[in-house]
């Protein structure tokens, strides 16, 4: 071991092995470090054991949360005078220093930092902070979990703070969550407490019954047919030669051409389920029925759309002609008056000329007539 190096608690193992390190100041370290709670490091400093702290490892570590206490061993909390509790956080003189009881209540110390208040009549609570108000007098009037509030007894009346889904003065009314009709597609709404559920009809699903179930998901169509989904139903677009709901039927092969003696008409073939291979012989296993079909050919003439167009055009033309005739008669209407001026004042008739014919005015009411022109010899003025 190199001279001048002192090994403590096997910390200086490097010295024993003869490693080229700077010798530690063993004498100085041992004189300052509390070797019962730590050890000397190679650099001469103290390394404390768990639960101890300080420059020389001379101070124990208190229990976490300890407020007014100390320790003799690690993780202890020994309370100072006047404090109590596990963490030394309760004042033993709370009744004299803080006076926690309110509204005239008397504080009684129970030891260990605890106390209780002796409340005067009409008050209650840990610190006599609550008054026997409307809530207490009514005996918890709020229903369905509602909270009664009366400003700690000082309010004249109580109010109920209702839980979600209830309403009313005392929370007695269950809110109808189906009032807005949230369920779609004819579903039945079932009201609950602050919730609802939809009883969906067949073919729909989802919280609001808005999802149409895919009836083609099970691939019901046969023969490679394409499936088209519907509401609680499906359609199969069968390939040529097949029919039925799921294309399970094989359509018959057309029979031989009709003979000359056969009556004209279509041939109706009964569909046969495709339970086996189709016979190769023509018409084998098929029943053909000839049906006479009488076709009455429509006489040549106007179709319904053309006939409607002609009627409408004729009605409009007649209306225009009638309006023109009425306006013409009104404009050229003549009146016969007794001798003298016309029997009707302007602007309807102008003064009579010679044979007392009245002049018709087409001007609006209130407009002056044009000045009278002298009639030509042998002519009568009329408009």
UniProtKB/Swiss-Prot annotation:
PROSITE patterns the UniProt entry points to: ASX_HYDROXYL (PS00010), EGF_1 (PS00022), EGF_2 (PS01186), EGF_3 (PS50026), EGF_CA (PS01187)
Q: In UniProt terms, what function does this protein have?
A: Regulates adipogenesis.
Identify the SMART domains for this entry: EGF, EGF_CA
Q: What is this protein called?
A: Protein delta homolog 2
Natural source organism: Bos taurus
Can you tell me where the transmembrane regions are?
Answer: 307-327
Domain EGF-like, chain residue ranges per copy: 27-58, 62-89, 91-129, 131-172, 174-210, 212-248
Residues assigned to the Extracellular compartment are: 27-306
Superkingdom, according to UniProt? Answer: Eukaryota
SUPFAM superfamilies given in the database record: EGF/Laminin (SSF57196)
Question: Gene3D superfamilies, per this entry?
Answer: Laminin
What cellular component terms from Gene Ontology apply here? Answer: membrane
How does the record say this protein sits in the membrane?
A: Single-pass type I membrane protein
Where does it reside? Answer: Membrane
Keyword Membrane, does the record have it? yes
Alphabetically ordered keywords of this record: Calcium, Disulfide bond, EGF-like domain, Glycoprotein, Membrane, Repeat, Signal, Transmembrane, Transmembrane helix
Going by the UniProt annotation, this protein carries glycans at 157
Cystine pairs: 29-40, 33-46, 48-57, 66-71, 79-88, 95-107, 101-117, 119-128, 135-148, 142-160, 162-171, 178-189, 183-198, 200-209, 216-227, 221-236, 238-247
Gene behind this protein: DLK2
Q: Taking the first listed entry, what is the main subcellular location of this protein, grouped into a coarse class?
A: membrane
